[in-house]
C-alpha cells in the first residue's frame, strides 16, 4: 500500500517537471510571437474576489509585507506554478485511482476535463468567448490546448513512474 508521503512526493516531483515544461512551451509562444490563452483562472479569481479582499485590507497588507504585486509577472508566474502543483496533488489524491486506463490516457482525460472547464466556463465568464475565441486565432487556441495537454499527460505518466519507483524502492529522491 502506498503511503501518503510517497504519493505526495511523486505528485510534487511529476508536477514540477510537467509545469516546468508547460511554462517553457507557453514562453516559447511569446518568442514566435503567438498569443495564447493564459492567466484565465487568475483573472477570474481577481474579478470575483478582488473587491472583497480590498475591503478587508488584504491588498495593503500584501504590499506592506513586500509580496509581489498580483498584476505583476512574478506573482503570475508563482500562481501558475502553485496551480500546476495543486493540479498534480488533485490528480494523485483524487483522480489517479478513479480514472480508467493507462497513465497517458488518464492524463488525456484530465486534460480534456480541465480544458473544457476553461474553454466553456472560465474564458466565457471573462468575456473572452468559448476557448478565448474572441481574442485568439485558431493557432493560438490550438497551441494553448497542446501545451495544456502536454502538462496533464506528462504529469500522469511521470506520476505513475515515480510512484511505482518509490513503491519498489528504486527512486532515490527524498522529500524529508
Predicted regions located by residue number:
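Short, charged juxtamembrane terminal tails flanking transmembrane helices
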Residues: 1-5, 163-176
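Hydrophobic alpha-helical transmembrane segments
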Residues: 8-16, 73-92, 96, 104-109, ...
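Alpha-helical transmembrane segments of multipass membrane proteins
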Residues: 14-26, 83, 87, 91, ...
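Internal alpha-helical transmembrane segments of multi-pass membrane proteins
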Residues: 95-117
Amino acid at each position: 500500500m502506498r503511503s501518503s508521503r510517497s504519493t505526495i512526493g511523486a505528485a510534487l516531483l511529476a508536477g514540477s517537471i510537467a509545469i516546468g515544461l508547460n511554462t517553457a512551451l507557453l514562453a516559447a509562444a511569446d518568442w514566435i510571437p503567438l498569443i495564447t490563452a493564459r492567466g484565465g483562472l487568475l483573472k477570474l479569481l481577481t474579478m470575483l474576489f478582488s473587491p472583497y479582499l480590498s475591503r478587508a485590507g488584504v491588498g495593503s497588507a500584501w504590499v506592506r509585507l513586500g509580496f509581489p504585486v498580483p498584476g505583476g509577472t512574478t506573482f503570475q508566474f508563482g500562481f501558475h506554478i502553485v496551480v500546476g502543483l495543486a493540479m498534480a496533488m488533485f490528480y494523485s489524491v483524487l483522480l489517479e485511482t478513479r480514472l480508467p486506463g493507462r497513465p497517458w490516457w488518464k492524463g488525456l482525460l484530465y486534460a480534456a476535463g480541465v480544458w473544457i472547464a476553461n474553454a466553456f466556463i472560465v474564458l466565457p465568464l471573462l468575456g473572452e468567448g468559448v476557448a478565448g475565441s474572441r481574442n485568439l486565432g485558431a493557432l493560438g487556441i490550438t497551441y494553448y490546448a497542446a501545451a495544456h495537454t502536454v502538462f496533464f499527460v506528462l504529469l500522469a505518466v511521470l506520476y505513475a513512474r515515480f510512484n511505482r519507483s518509490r513503491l519498489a524502492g528504486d527512486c532515490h529522491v527524498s522529500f524529508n
